[in-house]
A protein has these predicted regions:
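Short, charged recognition helix plus adjacent turn
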Residues: 1-4, 64, 74-86
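A short, Lys/Arg-rich alpha-helix, primarily the initiator
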Residues: 2-25
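Short basic helix-loop element that most often maps to the first helix and adjoining turn
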Residues: 17-36, 61
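Residues in the helix-turn-helix
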Residues: 32, 43, 72
Length: 86
């Protein structure tokens, strides 16, 4: 029987990747998100590929369109230490 590496308990995700993941989980295309936010599809693509910074104002607009808290987008790797210590 072959040996397998143990699964990672945590995966590091960039800000852009978090935008893409949440958008895709909601079944939205970049064009659909662009329509909801007024942010161009090209800019959304650049954000998702970490070519430009998300920024606070864009984070608020995108979070509203994706129905999530802006912190979910801005701090994708954040972990509540109080919960994880138990």
């Amino acid at each position: 029987m072959s040996q397998f590496r143990p699964a990672k308990k945590r995966v590091d995700v960039s800000v852009g990747e978090s935008v893409r993941i949440i958008r895709e989980l909601q079944g939205l295309s970049q064009n659909q998100l662009a329509e909801r936010t007024g942010i161009s599809q090209a800019t959304l693509s650049a954000i998702e590929n970490d070519r430009i910074r998300l920024g606070v104002e864009r984070a608020k607009v995108i979070a509203r369109a994706l129905r999530c808290h802006p912190a979910v987008l801005v701090f994708p790797g954040w972990e509540d230490r109080a919960d994880s210590a138990a």
